[in-house]
Amino acid sequence: MIYYNRTRIYIYGQYKNIPRIKKGHTMKLNIRLTAAILACASILTSASACSSQNASSATDSKNESSIAESSSAESKDNTKSDTTSDNSSASSESTASSDGSSSENKKPVGVDGVQTNGQLVVDIDGHTWGISLYGGGDGANYASYLNEFKEKVGSSVNVFNMVVPTAGAYYLPEGYEKYNASHRDSINSIANKLVNVINVDGYAALEAHTNEYIYTRTDHHWEPLGAYYAAKAFCEMAQVPVKELSTYKAETIEGFVGTMYAFTEYNERIKNDPDTFTYYIPSTDYTATYYTTDFKVDEQFTQFHSIFVDQPASGAYSTFMGGDQKIVKIETANKNGRKLCIFKDSYGNAEVPFFIDSFEEIYVCDIRYFDLYAPDFIKDNGITDVLFTMCTFSAVGENAEGIKNNLLSK
C-alpha cells in the first residue's frame, strides 16, 4: 500500500522523503523526478525483501495471535535482558541509561494480532492497538549532522539531543520481537556518537511511566502526557524550571482515530476503539507569532497568537500549532534570558507547551520544512539553547537528511 503527501511517500511501512527544493535554490525537474523514482524503487525492493522474509519465517498462515501465544508461554521463564541497556556507556555529557530491566523485555500479552503494511493490529488488555514495526538503524548520519551543527554554532550555544521511541518499544506484545528492532539500541548508538552535544535519555524518561496513557493506540504519535515526561527530562538537563503537570489545564478530545487507521488499510478494529486525546495548557502568559519556513510573517495567522488550534476529533494531534510547515516564535512572561530553538519532527509538537514555563523565548522549527541557514538563524536571534527532538523513525531514517539539506545548507 502506498500513501502520498506533498513531501513523503509511505510504502509498505516505511517513509521516504520526496526531494524538496529549498527556497532560493534551483534543480532541474528531470533530476528531481529521477531521484524520486529511484528512491521509491529502492523502498519497493526493500519492502519486497522484507515481505519475503516475513513469509518464509511464518509457519502458520493463520493470524499472528498463534505465534504470540506460543511464544508467550516459552518466554515466561526465559526473559532475556537487553544487552545494550546493560552494557551501554554514557559520555560525561549524556544522561545515564535506565537499569537493565528494560521495558523491551517486559512484553504485554496480545491477542488477535494481524500484520498489515508494516503495522501490527493487536488487542492488549481489552483495547486495540496499531503499532508501527521498527526496522532499526544506528543513526550515524543523524549524529554526524548534530556534531557538525554544534561545531558551527560554537561553545556559546548549548546543543541537546533527545530521540524518543515510538509505542512499539514498550507495548509490542510477546511473540513479535523478531519483527521489531530495538529502539534502545538505536538511541544508545546515537548517544555514543555525539561530540559536545548533550544527550537526554528520552527512552528512560518514558520507560518509567509505561503504565500510564503516554502513547496513542490509533495514531503513530504519543499522547501529550508522554511528551510531558520527555520535556521534563530535557528541562532538568538544561537546568531550567519545570512545573508539575497539576499546574496545567487539561483539555480532552474524545473519539480520536489517528493515522494508524489508514496505515493499516482501514482496519475496522482501529476505527471502533478510538483514543481519548488529552492536552495541557500552561498557566504562564505567552504570545505566539507564526512565520513561513523562511521566517516571514505568515499573513494567515496575523490575528492568531495561541499555540493551540481547534481541531475535529480526527485531527486531534494537529491541535499543536496546526501542523508542521511553519516556524513559530513564542514569547513568554519568563525573564530568565534563556532562548530555546527546537528542531523537531511532528513528535516535537506535543512537547512545546511544556517549555513555555521554562524559557523566555521559544522558536519551533521542523527539520523537514526550514529554508534558512540554521547557524545564522541561531546567532541572529540570540538563541542560547538548541534541542533536536524527534522519534527514532526520523533519527535513523530519511527525515534526518533534512538537517543536512535544510538546516546546514546555505
Residues covered by each model-derived region:
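Extracellular glycan-modifying ectodomains
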Residues: 23-24, 29, 49-69, 74-410
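Sec-dependent N-terminal signal peptides of Gram-positive bacterial secreted proteins and lipoproteins
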Residues: 29-53
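Short, Lys/Arg-enriched N-terminal segments with co-localized hydrophobic residues
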Residues: 2-26
